[in-house]
C-alpha cells in the first residue's frame, strides 16, 4: 500500500495562559505508519500538544502558539489556523450518548465520502463484532466504548491518529489488545499515530520512538525504547515522583464475531444530512414538548388559570352580590379576552421557558463536559448546527402548539367553572359571551398575531439564553447545576420583559 508523505512540525512554541512555556522551538517529523509515544510528568503539556494537533486548543483562553504544520494536503500556520488533520480518541471516549453504538459510527460515515468509509469498513467491523449496533453506549463496557471510539475516529479518515491516555481504566489484557490494535491499524492504513500515556508497559513494545516532553527545557527529546531508561528520564524531570504503573480493572474486550455473524459488516444505505437533522429535530421535539410529562404539566397549569380566572372573576370582583348576574355578560366577555390574550399565553410561556431552559442547559452542559461537542468538531460533523437549529425550531413549533393546547384546556375549565357558578344555563350562552370580543375576524387576526409574537419571542430569547449558557459552560459536570439555575433565571426574566413590553404596545 502507498504510504502517505511525512508530517512535519517546524519551530513550534506553546505558551500557556499563565505564561508558562510548554514547548519551545520544537521541530518534529512523523513518518507514515509510525507510532510515537509521548511521555512526561503531569502538567508538562502532553495533552495540550495533541489538542493543538487535532484543532481543539481553546485559542480564546489566552494560549500563545507559533509554528507550522506540513501535511500531505498543504501547510497550516498554527499561530492563526486550527489543525484539521488530527483525529483524537478522547480519554473519556466522548461517545454521543443520545445515539446507539451503531449510530455513533454511522453519523461519521454518512458525513464522509463513500469511498473513504468503504475502505475502512472491514477494519472497523473486525473490531466491533461482539457489540450490538442497536445497544445504547451506556450499556457498553469500558473496553467496548474504547473500541467504538477508535472505530469512529478511523471512519473520519484523519491524516494523523491521536490517543489521549487510551489505556486508562483497562486491565492488562485489554491494554495489550489495544496496543496491538493501534500498531496493526497504523501498519495497514499508513496513518501515523501519537500516543500520550502514563501507563507505558503495553505501548513501549509497539512504539517506533519514545519522546519525553521535558518541562524544565520545554523540549521534546527522544529517549531509548526501554522502560528503565524512560523511568529514569521522567524521574530526572520531576524528582521524587515515581513512575506510573498500569491500573487493573475487570474490563476485557469481547471476542470478535465471525464474519458471517458480524452485524457491522452488513452494507447499509447512506443517510443524508437532512436525515440526520430530522433525527435531532425529532429528538428535541420529544424532549422539549411532546413528552407526556410536559403535556400534563402544561394542561394542569392552564386548567388552573382557567378555573381561577372565572372563579375569582365572578366571586370577588368589586360589585359582587346581585350585580354578579346583572353584569354577567360584560364580566364573562372581559374574562374571555383576558384569558385568551394575556393570562394563558403568559402563564404557558413562563412554564415552558422555565422547564425548557433547564433541559437545554443541562443537555448542552453534559455534552460539553463529556467532550461530545468537541468530538463532533474533531470528526468534522456539523453537530453544533444540527443541535442548535433543532432546538430553536422545536422551541418555535412546540411553543405555538402548546399555547394553542393550553388555551383549549383553559377554555374547558373555565366553562366547567362557569357551569358550576351558573347552573342550568346553556353552554351556548357561555360561548356567545366568552368569545364576544374575539368575534371580529379582523381584530382576532391582529390579536392572535400579538399572541404569536409574544410566544415566539419568549421561546427564542429564553431558549437562546439557555443555548449560550450551555455551550459556553466549563468542561465540568459539577457546574451543570449552576448552568441550570442561570438559564432559568435568564430565560424567565427575558420572558417577563417580553410580555410586559409587547402588552404595552398591544393595548
Spans of features found by a protein language model:
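Helix-to-loop junction immediately C-terminal to a conserved catalytic motif
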Residues: 54
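ABC ATPase NBD coupling module
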Residues: 73-87
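Q-loop/switch helix immediately C-terminal to the Walker
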Residues: 92, 98-114
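Conserved ABC ATPase signature
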Residues: 136-140
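Hydrophobic anchor residue at the start of the ABC signature
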Residues: 150
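Catalytic Walker B motif of ABC-type/P-loop ATPase nucleotide-binding domains
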Residues: 161-164
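Conserved beta-strand-loop-alpha-helix hinge in the C-terminal portion
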Residues: 216-245
Amino acid at each position: 500500500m502507498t504510504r502517505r508523505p511525512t508530517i512535519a512540525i517546524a519551530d513550534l512554541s506553546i505558551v500557556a495562559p499563565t505564561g508558562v512555556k510548554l514547548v519551545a522551538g520544537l521541530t518534529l517529523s512523523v513518518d507514515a505508519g509510525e507510532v510515537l509515544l509521548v511521555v512526561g510528568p503531569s502538567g508538562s503539556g502532553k495533552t495540550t500538544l495533541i489538542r493543538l494537533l487535532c484543532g481543539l486548543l481553546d485559542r480564546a483562553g489566552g494560549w500563545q502558539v507559533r509554528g507550522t504544520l506540513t501535511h500531505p494536503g498543504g501547510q497550516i500556520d498554527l499561530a492563526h489556523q486550527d489543525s484539521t488533520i488530527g483525529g483524537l480518541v478522547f480519554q473519556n471516549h466522548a461517545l454521543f450518548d443520545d445515539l446507539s453504538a451503531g449510530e455513533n459510527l454511522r453519523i461519521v460515515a454518512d458525513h464522509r465520502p463513500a469511498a473513504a468509509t468503504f475502505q475502512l469498513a472491514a477494519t472497523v467491523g473486525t473490531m466491533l463484532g461482539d457489540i450490538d449496533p442497536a445497544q445504547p453506549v451506556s450499556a457498553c463496557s469500558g473496553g467496548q466504548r474504547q473500541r467504538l471510539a477508535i472505530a469512529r475516529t478511523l471512519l473520519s479518515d484523519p491524516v494523523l491518529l491521536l490517543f489521549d491516555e487510551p489505556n486508562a481504566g483497562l486491565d492488562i489484557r485489554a491494554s495489550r489488545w489495544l496496543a496491538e490494535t493501534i500498531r496493526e491499524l497504523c501498519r495497514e492504513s499508513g496513518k501515523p499515530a501519537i500516543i500520550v500515556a502514563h501507563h507505558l508497559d503495553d505501548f513501549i513494545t509497539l512504539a517506533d520512538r519514545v519522546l519525553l516532553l521535558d518541562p524544565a527545557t520545554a523540549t521534546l527529546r527522544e529517549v531509548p525504547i526501554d522502560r528503565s531508561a524512560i523511568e529514569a528520564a521522567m524521574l530526572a524531570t520531576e524528582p521524587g515522583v515515581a513512575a506510573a504503573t498500569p491500573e487493573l480493572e475487570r474490563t476485557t474486550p469481547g471476542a470478535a464475531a465471525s464474519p458471517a455473524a458480524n452485524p457491522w459488516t452488513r452494507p447499509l444505505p447512506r443517510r443524508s444530512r437532512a436525515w440526520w437533522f430530522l433525527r435531532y429535530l425529532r429528538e428535541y421535539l420529544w424532549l422539549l414538548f411532546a413528552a407526556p410529562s410536559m403535556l400534563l404539566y402544561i394542561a394542569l397549569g392552564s386548567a388552573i388559570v382557567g378555573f381561577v380566572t372565572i372563579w375569582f372573576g365572578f366571586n370577588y370582583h368589586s360589585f359582587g352580590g346581585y350585580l354578579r348576574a346583572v353584569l354577567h355578560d360584560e364580566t364573562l366577555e372581559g374574562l374571555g379576552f383576558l384569558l385568551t390574550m394575556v393570562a394563558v399565553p403568559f402563564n404557558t410561556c413562563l412554564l415552558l421557558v422555565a422547564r425548557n431552559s433547564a433541559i437545554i442547559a443541562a443537555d448542552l452542559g453534559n455534552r460539553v463536559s463529556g467532550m461530545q461537542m468537541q468530538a463532533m468538531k474533531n470528526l468534522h460533523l456539523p453537530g453544533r448546527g444540527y443541535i442548535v437549529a433543532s432546538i430553536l425550531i422545536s422551541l418555535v413549533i412546540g411553543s405555538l402548539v402548546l399555547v394553542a393546547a393550553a388555551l383549549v384546556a383553559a377554555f374547558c375549565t373555565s366553562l366547567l367553572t362557569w357551569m358550576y357558578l351558573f347552573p342550568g344555563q346553556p353552554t351556548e350562552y357561555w360561548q356567545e359571551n366568552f368569545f364576544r370580543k374575539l368575534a371580529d375576524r379582523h381584530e382576532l387576526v391582529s390579536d392572535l398575531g400579538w399572541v404569536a409574537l409574544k410566544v415566539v419571542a419568549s421561546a427564542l430569547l429564553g431558549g437562546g439564553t439557555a443555548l449560550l449558557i450551555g455551550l459556553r459552560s466549563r468542561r465540568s459536570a459539577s457546574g451543570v447545576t449552576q448552568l441550570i439555575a442561570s438559564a432559568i433565571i435568564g430565560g424567565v426574566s427575558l420572558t417577563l420583559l417580553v410580555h410586559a413590553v409587547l402588552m404595552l404596545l398591544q393595548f
